[in-house]
């Protein structure tokens, strides 16, 4: 491709609403153009990146035995009503009506449609296993779209769905796809981690996220440097605390803590470690009663160490806490504690409630908590002496760096990441809801076992940039760069020798299968170099009249700080030697 025929459009400054580096650089490099909140056009330079990502994904999906199809973006609401997701999903699900008043949704995912296809087509065990995938536009009506392609409303995803006869076969399919994902992200040239994850709204009991490591990532990735353990923050666990509870050494005492309503403030006021304080979090559950349709609410008190944060995903999986979990209202708190938040504790309750203690709190002695009276706390609190043992002891918290790894092989570390892929074993959640079954060898109907596998095609360029950039611009890995190499002839319009050398090198690169662009726009060297450094083309060759007189060209990898002189006859081999694809 020659630059004069291509579309190159760069900006000196990023738009004011571009918050993160990837958004700023994609706008400045002319990869995307904003149309509306969370909606972007993929410009020619950006589309080349997407097409390379899609090509790698297709190759590896096909290699893994998946078969491509395409499903509609607009889907009948009836399918979503079968699974209950039409009502359960919030305003992120875009609901529309046609001219006849019929309800439809704009797909954020395609579980319902693929399950509908499967129940019509996969009638016999002889047709299994099957794995279908698509690369398709999706829409999620984000309340606050931001960060460019990182959290847009319209986006492109690769989603795949496997169908098997039993859990063992389904888990085998899951492992095939998990390995395919590792090959995909290895080929992208990105640093990533596959981490255990919660399945969330899609459901299932086996799930992994693929996270691109980046300091600006939205997600916390937990891993153990001494082992293979890795999980996202929702799923991560620490090794259960060992030992026995210490003996009580202090008397229960009510202490004035004027205007000190947080554990940190109380610890500082009393001159004690934050770890000796206990925070009280009041939750409630709402359970619909089948008999009359009324809602039964129950209030729960969760106790965590003052330096720990609640993990709501873990809490929602506890017995009795899974139905309609929410934070209690101020009225509910007042009724049970006789006090407003900031000074709450488990002693002296106005009304009884269930108390759930985190594993660490259950082993504490002489701890500090609210006195259920404004501006007062209790010190020297001890289980058994000052209050009954908790109704339940469980893991309620997010892990912190330095916790012991649950596999016992070291301590946990935390880094930031950007989720770009997710694999789920769904089981029969959707097949049972939609009556998708096959006949086994005995002619008996059995529900299809399903898996679900997604990759954020349009999120990947943003994640790659967050991981690979510098002050000059983007640094693309070879495999997904818009162009692998760029030839920059200086004074091409004035020098027949430069033009001839540029044309020959361009032809040589094309013949060698290198995705090359020849910059024949006639720009000044400084402007030309700045454009390609901003756009992030990995390999740059500069041809000048002075260099040709010495039979040399200049080569510079995008990560290099300076150029290297290379003999003209050796330049092709030199570039190929630096390439990683």
From Swiss-Prot:
Q: Which terms in the GO cellular component ontology are assigned?
A: cytosol
Say if the entry is tagged with keyword Protease.
no
Family that this chain belongs to: Belongs to the class-II aminoacyl-tRNA synthetase family. ProS type 1 subfamily.
Q: Which organism is it from?
A: Verminephrobacter eiseniae (strain EF01-2)
Catalytic activity line of the entry: tRNA(Pro) + L-proline + ATP = L-prolyl-tRNA(Pro) + AMP + diphosphate
Q: Which gene encodes it?
A: proS
User: Which processes are annotated in GO (biological process)?
Assistant: prolyl-tRNA aminoacylation
Under the heading PANTHER family, the entry gives: MITOCHONDRIAL RIBOSOME PROTEIN L39/PROLYL-TRNA LIGASE FAMILY MEMBER, PROLINE--TRNA LIGASE
Q: What molecular function terms (GO) are annotated for this protein?
A: aminoacyl-tRNA deacylase activity; ATP binding; proline-tRNA ligase activity
- The protein's name is Proline--tRNA ligase
- Report the EC code(s) recorded for this entry: 6.1.1.15
Q: Which domain of life is it from?
A: Bacteria
Q: What is the lineage of its organism?
A: Bacteria, Pseudomonadati, Pseudomonadota, Betaproteobacteria, Burkholderiales
Places the protein is found: Cytoplasm
């Amino acid at each position: 491709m020659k630059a004069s025929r291509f579309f190159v459009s760069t900006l000196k400054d990023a738009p004011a609403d571009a918050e993160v580096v990837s958004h700023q650089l994609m706008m400045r490099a002319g990869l995307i153009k904003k149309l509306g909140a969370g909606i972007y056009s993929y410009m020619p330079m950006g589309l080349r990146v997407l097409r390379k990502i899609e090509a790698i994904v297709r190759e590896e999906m096909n290699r893994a035995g998946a078969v491509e199809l395409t499903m509609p973006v607009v889907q009948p609401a009836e399918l979503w009503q079968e699974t209950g997701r039409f009502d359960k999903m919030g305003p992120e699900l875009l609901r529309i009506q046609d001219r006849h008043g019929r309800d439809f949704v704009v797909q954020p995912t395609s579980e319902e449609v693929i399950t509908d296809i499967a129940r019509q087509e996969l009638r016999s065990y002889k047709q299994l296993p099957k794995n279908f995938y698509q690369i398709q536009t999706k829409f999620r009506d984000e309340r606050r779209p931001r960060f460019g392609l990182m959290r847009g409303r319209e986006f492109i995803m690769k989603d795949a769905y496997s169908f098997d006869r039993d859990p063992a076969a389904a888990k085998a399919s899951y492992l095939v796809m998990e390995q395919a994902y590792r090959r995909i992200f290895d080929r992208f040239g990105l640093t990533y981690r596959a981490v255990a994850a919660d399945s969330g709204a899609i459901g299932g009991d086996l799930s992994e996220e693929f996270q691109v490591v980046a300091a600006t990532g939205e997600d916390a990735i937990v891993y153990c440097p001494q082992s293979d353990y890795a999980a996202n923050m929702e799923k991560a666990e620490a090794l259960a605390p060992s030992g026995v509870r210490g003996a009580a050494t202090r008397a229960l005492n009510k202490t004035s803590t004027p205007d000190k309503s947080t554990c940190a403030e109380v610890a500082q006021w009393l001159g004690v470690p934050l770890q000796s304080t206990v925070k009280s979090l009041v939750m409630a559950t709402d359970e619909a009663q089948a008999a009359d349709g009324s809602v039964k609410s129950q209030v729960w008190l969760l106790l965590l160490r003052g330096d720990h944060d609640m993990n709501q995903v873990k809490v929602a999986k506890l017995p009795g806490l899974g139905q309609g979990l929410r934070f209690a209202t101020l009225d509910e708190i007042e009724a049970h504690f006789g006090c407003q938040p900031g000074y709450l504790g488990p002693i002296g309750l106005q009304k009884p409630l269930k108390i759930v203690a985190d594993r660490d709190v259950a082993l504490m002695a002489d701890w500090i908590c609210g006195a259920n009276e404004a501006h007062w706390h209790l010190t020297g609190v001890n289980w058994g002496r000052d209050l009954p043992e908790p109704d339940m002891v469980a893991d309620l918290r997010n892990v912190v760096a330095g916790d012991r790894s649950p596999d016992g092989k070291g301590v946990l570390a935390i880094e930031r990441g950007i989720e770009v892929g997710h694999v789920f074993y769904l089981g029969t959640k959707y097949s049972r809801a939609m009556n998708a079954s096959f006949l086994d060898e005995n002619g008996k109907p059995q529900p299809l076992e399903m898996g679900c596998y997604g990759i954020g095609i349009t999120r990947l360029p943003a994640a790659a940039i967050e991981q690979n950039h510098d002050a000059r611009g983007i640094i693309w890995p070879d495999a997904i760069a818009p162009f692998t190499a760029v030839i920059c002839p200086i004074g091409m319009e004035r020098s027949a020798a430069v033009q001839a050398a540029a044309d020959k090198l361009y032809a040589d690169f094309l013949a060698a299968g290198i995705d090359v662009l020849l910059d024949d726009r006639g720009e000044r060297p400084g402007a030309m170099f700045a454009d390609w450094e901003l756009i992030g083309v990995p390999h740059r060759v500069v041809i000048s009249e002075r260099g040709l007189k010495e039979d040399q060209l200049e080569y510079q990898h995008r990560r290099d700080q300076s150029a290297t002189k290379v003999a003209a006859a050796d330049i092709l081999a030199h570039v190929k030697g630096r390439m990683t694809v």
